[in-house]
Amino acid sequence: LYPISTGRNLAYGGSAPVHSGSVVLDLKRMNRVLEVDERNAYALVEPGVSYFDLYNYIQERGIDVWIDPPDPGWGSVIGNALDGGGGWTAYPYRDHFGAHCGMEVVLGDGDIVRTGMGAVPNAKTWQENKWGYGPWVDGLFRQGNMGVVTKMGFWLMPRPEAYISGTARVMNDEGAIGLMDTLNHLENLHIVNGSTQLGGGGGGAGFGGGAGWSLQVPIYGPPDVIRAQLAYARSKFEQIEGCTFTESEMIMTPAPGEEPPPGVRLVNFGIPDLSTFSMLGRSPFQPNPAGGHIGFSPILPRRGEELIRFRDWYQANASEVSGGENLGIVGPVFMTNWERSLVGLIMFPVSKDPAHNEKIRDAFVRWVELAAAEGWAEYRAPTVYQDLIARTYSFNDNALTRMREKIKDAVDPNGIISAGRYGVWPKHLRDA
């Protein structure tokens, strides 16, 4: 069995099983929102509930909380969290697995388990305390194949009153080191709580392009508070030599049932949509768009020196890896929306040309190998490369994978759930 729900896992292999011949278990019809508690700001949902579904449920009832949507609003709230996805509002809510609290799982042997406080009959705090008693097992089901998750709780964000942002700009790489150090300081103090965006750096190293670097820092909260937080952030960034800082107008957030302000990016206001997919659509500027892309997403230390080293490493190796051809690979784009680390995203286009796609596949494998040699590894992987990337987590003769296999054999003795997902195979298929 290979469980899926409403999401499509775009850029990471789609909804296809890892193991050929698997039976796809579609959970879309398990689509109930079981509870939304406004006073303690949490939801309990089934796997067929999409971000659109949960948003509409909240709006229709006038509940004054936000969800944290990723780019694909059609995606499953549970599925996105289990695959390690994230969103675009405030931390910690945009770390979707990190913001979950309690789950119900059907194991491979048919046993039904509730994690955390949910293991207590008639539990009153299942969605309010994630740890419960004894070893915490929820992580076994993130990118896992130990069972089928049938319910999951999530902490929601009380609607903040207002939103404001500032943008710090530097003109050289030395300034980027200061940007990262200052961002770390501000986020670790929870002064900047929104999903930041880094651009620039030259060589396609961000959405902004150009030789300099820019960093947008959004903040959510009460107007007087966030105005003071932004002023403090500005004072810190302006200590970087040559740094300029501009501020946006404050935006008051819409109450349930109100229209969002014009021109805003909806996902930054807890509103799911699909606008990001327009970049893949046909237009006068892009008459023959690619058929999609696959993402290479290594995790990097949140330091300016490492950001620059990754960019230079990519540029130094790009021609050799692509065989001297322009394969349309885009990157690196540096994502700063995970606290305490960076993602050095590289996007590989998928086309209707089999020969081109074969070159893309070869280039992807080579980038994985080169990155692993530098100590950089991915946090998420397209289906076809999950074994390859699992092998880069090889400390002590692959001890982590061996431990996962032992647990897999214990809770799914017949190996029937999602064989091979994220490099974990059941006993009867390990050497197949």
Mark where each language-model region is.
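Glycine-rich, charged/polar anion/phosphate-binding loops
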Residues: 87-92, 123-124, 132-141, 151-153, ...
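Generic secondary-structure signature for well-ordered alpha-helical cores
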Residues: 59-63, 105-112, 154, 175-192, ...
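FAD-binding subdomain of flavoenzyme oxidoreductases
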Residues: 33-36, 44-183, 432
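Conserved glycine-rich FAD pyrophosphate-binding loop
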Residues: 1-7, 11-28, 243-432
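Residues forming anionic-ligand binding surfaces in small-molecule and nucleic-acid pockets
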Residues: 31-38, 150-162, 210, 282-297
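Flexible loop/turn segments at secondary-structure boundaries
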Residues: 9-13, 51-53, 74-76, 122, ...
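C-terminal cap/substrate-recognition region of VAO/PCMH-type FAD-linked oxidoreductases
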Residues: 137, 153-154, 164-175, 179-274
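Short, conserved charged micro-motifs
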Residues: 53, 173-180, 223-232, 305-310, ...
